[in-house]
C-alpha cells in the first residue's frame, strides 16, 4: 500500500505497478511520538503524518512539496528510516506549458525510482485502466472546504448534516479530465505530458499561484452552505476563509482543529448550518 497526501499525486502511475494507493488521513489521539522529534509549531497535519510513520502504519509514502511543513515532514521521516519507500514529488505552483513539462519529467523520475525500489516493470495497460469517469451529481449539497479533513471529521460532518456533503478539500476533489482512448495512441513522453496536464488542470489548490478558478466552487448554484476547516499553525487557508466570509452568499461555518481526534469533537457543531 502506497500512502499519499495530495490530490496532485500521480496515483494512476502506481496502478501500472499493480499497487494500491490510499490517502493518509490519520487523526491520532495525540502527538506523543511526533512531538519528540518535530518542532512544536509544525502544523497538526504534518505531525499526524510523522505520528503514523512512527507508529508503523506507513511503509511507502509519496509526499508533495506543496509547503514548508511538508518539506520538514519529508526531512524528519527520512531521518527515522521507518519508510521502505519515501519520495518527495516536486509540484509546480503554476499550470502553464513549461510547468506541465516539468511535472511530466517529475513523474518519469518517480516511475524510475519505484521501478528501482520494487524491482517491478511498469505496465502501461495497468496505468491506462486506472482512469475512470465518475458521474457528476447535480444535487444540492454542503461543501467542505479549506484544509484536508480526516475520515473521522468527514464522517462526523456527514452524520450531522441533512443534505449531501461534498469534500472539496485538497484530497477530496480529485477529478482528472482524461480520455483514455487518446492516451493509448501516444508514445510514453506524450502520454505522461498529457497526464501532467490533467493533474494540473484540476480545481486548483489554494497553494497554486493562480487559484482564481476556485471561485467556481463558491458560485455553484447547488452549493447551499460551506463548512470551512482550518488547522492550527497553517496560515494558507485563513486568507481564503477571510475572502469567502466577505463575499459568500450562503451559510458559512468555520471549524479549526489541530488534526487530533480529540480536537475533532470540539471543532464546532456542523448542524448549525
Regions found by a protein language model. Give the residues of each.
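An N-terminal assembly and electron-transfer interface module characteristic of large anaerobic redox
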Residues: 1-273
Amino acid at each position: 500500500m502506497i500512502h499519499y497526501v495530495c490530490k496532485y499525486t500521480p496515483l494512476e502511475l502506481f496502478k501500472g505497478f499493480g499497487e494500491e494507493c490510499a490517502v493518509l488521513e490519520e487523526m491520532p489521539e495525540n502527538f506523543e511520538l511526533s512531538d519528540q522529534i518535530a518542532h512544536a509549531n509544525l502544523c497538526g497535519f504534518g505531525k499526524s503524518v510523522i505520528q503514523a510513520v512512527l507508529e508503523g502504519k506507513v511503509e511507502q509514502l509519496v509526499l508533495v512539496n506543496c509547503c514548508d511543513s511538508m518539506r520538514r515532514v519529508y526531512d524528519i521521516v527520512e531521518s527515522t528510516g521507518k519508510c521502505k519507500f519515501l519520495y518527495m514529488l516536486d509540484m509546480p505552483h503554476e499550470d502553464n506549458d513549461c510547468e506541465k513539462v516539468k511535472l511530466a519529467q517529475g513523474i518519469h523520475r518517480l516511475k524510475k525510482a519505484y521501478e528501482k525500489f520494487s524491482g517491478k516493470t511498469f505496465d502501461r495497460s495497468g496505468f491506462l485502466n486506472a482512469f475512470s469517469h465518475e458521474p457528476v451529481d447535480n444535487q444540492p449539497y454542503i461543501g467542505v472546504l479549506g484544509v484536508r479533513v480526516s475520515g473521522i471529521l468527514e464522517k462526523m460532518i456527514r452524520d450531522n448534516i441533512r443534505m449531501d456533503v461534498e469534500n472539496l478539500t485538497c484530497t477530496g476533489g480529485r477529478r482528472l479530465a482524461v480520455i483514455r482512448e487518446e492516451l493509448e495512441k501516444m508514445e510514453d513522453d506524450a502520454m505522461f505530458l498529457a497526464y501532467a496536464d490533467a493533474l494540473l488542470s484540476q480545481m486548483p489548490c489554494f497553494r497554486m499561484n493562480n487559484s482564481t478558478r476556485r471561485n467556481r466552487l463558491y458560485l455553484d448554484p447547488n452549493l447551499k452552505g460551506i463548512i470551512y476547516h482550518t488547522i492550527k499553525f497553517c496560515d494558507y487557508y485563513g486568507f481564503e476563509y477571510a475572502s469567502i466570509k466577505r463575499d459568500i452568499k450562503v451559510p458559512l461555518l468555520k471549524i479549526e482543529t489541530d488534526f487530533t481526534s480529540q480536537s475533532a469533537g470540539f471543532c464546532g457543531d456542523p448542524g448549525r448550518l
